[in-house]
A protein has these predicted regions:
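C-terminal lobe/lid and adjacent interdomain/linker elements of RecA-like ASCE P-loop ATPase modules
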Residues: 246-320
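Walker B motif beta-strand of ABC-family P-loop ATPases
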Residues: 229-231
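Phosphate-binding P-loop
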Residues: 221-224, 254-256
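Phosphate-coordinating catalytic segments in nucleotide- and nucleic-acid-processing enzymes
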Residues: 5-218, 223, 292-320
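Walker B catalytic acidic pair
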Residues: 233-235
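Walker A/P-loop
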Residues: 2
């Protein structure tokens, strides 16, 4: 939606949604300044740029994000005011070298947004309006390796918790339940335990294989993304082919149930085939997009689920 780009919330959503899955940045205490800085490549240039194109109603649009960092001397009182602590001006103020950032968003050469942020804008918002964050979750292909899950949402939903256990039987047929180790939690992360018929005591989830951890990560991420957007990179990694149908079917059906827009990527022909065919009742809700290079451009080919299956099965066309 082009109008969405014009809103100040678009910047906060972009910064928050893109960095919330980064280790240590899931806390909302990080400022927009810190998150926007993280979006751009680290280089020696003072001005950084992100550019992308998209097609809407047969018209190609170009979006450019420009970031420029610079420093200004501010008094200690001004800094404290920016942080929301005090409006009082002190008689002897220390001067502080403060980093600022100008962020501009252009659409087709026309300026949509021009905002200024400071490293001390911890709590400030434009015009005291409340930021409307879109519930967006990004799952990288290796996130399960760090035992980083979204299980707090799962444990608060009895119905989906039971459904998830039914799927996890594919990895451990003796699994009984999953809970939080109240003694083993740290300030940054909860420790989760698996109850199994094979063991007298609960086993830490981190001791299980990558397949179990990846399945739990994907399913918990779906539940955490209710009424939002879920992006999964290389969704099939660490999932054995024998378990793909059940897991993918649950993910897709639950995404529909919870009103989630789901984007998944893969380079695996077998995984793409599995996800397209795992639940025929959902095939009218799926599209396959293939990115490919032509000359100096990256182009997109869109196929419906039915077209993609026909292309693979009847004509042996490469859809990856």
């Amino acid at each position: 939606n082009i109008n969405f780009l014009k809103g100040i919330d678009s910047v906060r959503n972009l910064a928050y949604s893109t960095t919330r899955s980064v280790r240590g940045m899931e806390r909302t205490s990080f400022s927009t300044f810190e998150r926007v800085n993280y979006l751009f490549p680290v280089d020696e240039e003072e001005v950084s740029k992100i550019e992308y194109n998209f097609k809407l109603e047969n018209k190609t649009h170009s979006v450019n994000l420009f970031k420029e960092n610079y420093f200004e001397l501010l008094s200690d009182s001004e800094v404290r005011k920016m942080m929301g602590y005090s409006n009082k001006v002190r008689e002897c103020d220390e001067m502080i070298d403060t980093e600022f950032m100008n962020l501009k968003i252009d659409l087709d050469g026309q300026e949509l947004l021009n905002e200024k942020y400071s490293e001390y804008d911890r709590f400030a918002t434009n015009g005291k309006q409340e930021t409307k964050l879109i519930n967006t979750t990004l799952v990288s292909s290796f996130k399960h390796v760090y035992d980083d899950f979204y299980l707090s949402k799962v444990l608060n939903n009895v119905e989906l918790y039971q459904e998830m256990l039914g799927v996890l039987i594919e990895f451990d047929e003796d699994i009984i339940g999953l809970n939080v180790d109240s003694k083993g939690n740290s300030a940054w992360r909860k420790r989760y335990m698996i109850l199994s018929k094979n063991h007298k005591e609960a086993i830490p989830l981190e001791l299980y294989g990558d397949g179990m951890k990846k399945a739990i990560l994907l399913m918990s991420a779906v539940i955490a993304s209710k009424n939002g957007i879920l992006l999964i990179d290389e969704f099939e990694t660490s999932i054995h082919t024998s378990a793909m149908n059940k897991i993918f079917s649950w993910i897709l059906s639950t995404a529909v149930k919870l009103n989630i827009q789901l984007f998944i990527t893969s380079h695996s022909k077998e995984a793409i085939d599995k996800v397209l065919k795992c639940d025929p009742t959902l095939q009218d809700k799926m599209n396959l997009y293939t990115l490919y290079k032509k000359d100096d451009s990256t182009l997109t080919r869109k196929l419906s689920c039915y077209e993609a299956i026909e292309a693979m099965d009847d004509y042996d066309i490469e859809v990856r």
